[in-house]
Amino acid sequence: DRGYSYPPESYGILAWWDYGHWITFMAKRIPNSNPFQDNLAGSSGVAGFFTATSEGEGANIAAKLKSKYVITDFSLVRGNFAAMALWSDPTRGTTPFQAVIYRQNNPPSSELVQQPIFTPDYYNTMIIRMHIFDGSMVTPEEVIYIEFRDQSYEGRTIPVIVKSQYVNATEGAAKIKSFNAAAPAGMHAILASIEVTKPLREVPALQHFRLVYESPQNASQYYQISSTNVQLQDMKSIKIFEIVPGATIHGTGTIEIPLETNTGRSFVYRQESVNGTFVVPYATGGGTPGGVRATGKYTIIETGRTYEVTDDDVREGRVVNGNG
């Protein structure tokens, strides 16, 4: 209001509002939102960023907020996801991301209970792509094949599960196509997922957001997580991503690079080409400011061709040539 201008090198930290004062007083940086909840609501605010279902949409919001880093928290995947969706769009809320189907409670009882399921768009949100998938491309593996009937219940029609089973994604797609082509009246088949780690469709890689730090603490120290979900058991509570232009590599297929985080966790970042081009966010030498580093070169799986990428290549958006 008094015409104060930030210096050119200043930047914002994009995080959920409850991190704002910590960022200000502990990190001495500028939060994009805080408990006063500036820049929080609407499709162009922090809530809109985390629930955006395309990287382009998320990147545009971050650019508007002048963000350089993004802090994600496992709570945004669990309890706070609904709050983010409502802050982003109070009319639609969680409708694009979660649905409800009904099942019998302890058959042969006729009592019906709700079974929440995730939609494909849930897995495309920025918060899931960053915190759960580390920004890497993910292909669906195991999904739930469900046959359900339309049933009248308390004056309305609801979907009630008749049959459900775990199948691989390819088999599931064929089964719903076959069933729905000749389904009896009032019967339908869908694919569903009830786990945050199991998408229903391929989730593309993020090209401009790279993991630079993760907390030593696992999310399981603070949240109840099934012991059978190995991926979530090793999920870190907090992660920090840096926004970068990314280096361009010309090629077709899938490119990958092995990475090790500051906690010693290993994962592989994969990306599928778009129009004969990859835009990659990690350097092959050195490491990120928070200690995430590559342990090998970029490799196009289909050709075996390798690429070395410097941090300057990533930060300046350069085109990189291959090594063979």
Model feature map: region roles:
Residues 1-324:
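Extracytoplasmic
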